[in-house]
């Protein structure tokens, strides 16, 4: 009788069935961009330029700007985007004056072009002009004549956006 009661008890007891569920884990490893020039616009003022002196090698203006990067692992990348002047120059911003642009270089001088555009998404590697001890970046802007075209007088301007990030 005890066996029969035990058998009936076992039959009446429901068996719990466990079902496997998947756990989805997501997120984003976010590398924050650097703050450039304390978040203020950078002004490069050439003043008056004599068109006869625009020979792509003089009249440069060098700027040193502060950079603050909360994440400093890997290499520093810079991205400068703006209207590129034609003629095969990948570091020259077009201005509103025909045949006249502004060439950009990393560091002081004209040995390392500051290439414009997205590059690999983060821009291009910084190879000159970085002073990590002072948290600054130096770049040089140079008046540029495309070809032998005549430069008309007048106010000129161009704009670009700059961002920097470690990656």
From Swiss-Prot:
InterPro entries: Adhesion_dom_fimbrial, Adhesion_dom_fimbrial_sf, Adhesion_dom_sf, Bact_Fimbrial_Adh_Pro, P_pili_tip_PapF
Species annotation: Escherichia coli
Keyword Signal annotated: yes
GO cellular component, one term: extracellular region
Miscellaneous remark of the record: Strains of E.coli that cause infection of the human urinary tract produce pap-pili which are hair-like appendages consisting of about 1000 helically arranged subunits of the protein PapA. These pili mediate binding to digalactoside-containing glycolipids present on the epithelial cells which line the urinary tract.
GO biological process, one term: cell adhesion involved in single-species biofilm formation
Name by which UniProt lists this protein: Fimbrial adapter PapF
Pfam families assigned to the protein according to its UniProt record, in alphabetical order: Fimbrial (PF00419)
């Amino acid at each position: 009788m005890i066996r029969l009661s035990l058998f009936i008890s076992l039959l009446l007891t429901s068996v719990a069935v466990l079902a496997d569920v998947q756990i989805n884990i997501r997120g984003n490893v976010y590398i924050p961009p650097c703050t450039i020039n304390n978040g203020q616009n950078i002004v490069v003022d050439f003043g008056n330029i004599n068109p006869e002196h625009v020979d792509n090698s003089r009249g440069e203006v060098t700027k040193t700007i502060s950079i603050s990067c909360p994440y400093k692992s890997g290499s520093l990348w810079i991205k400068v985007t703006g209207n590129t002047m034609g003629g095969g120059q990948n570091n020259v911003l077009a201005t509103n004056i025909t045949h006249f642009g502004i060439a950009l270089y990393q560091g002081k001088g004209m040995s390392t072009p500051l290439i414009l555009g997205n590059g690999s998404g983060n821009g291009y590697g910084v190879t000159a002009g970085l002073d990590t001890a002072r948290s600054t970046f130096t770049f040089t802007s140079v008046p540029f004549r495309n070809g032998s075209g005549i430069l008309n007088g007048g106010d000129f301007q161009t704009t670009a956006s700059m961002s920097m990030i470690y990656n």
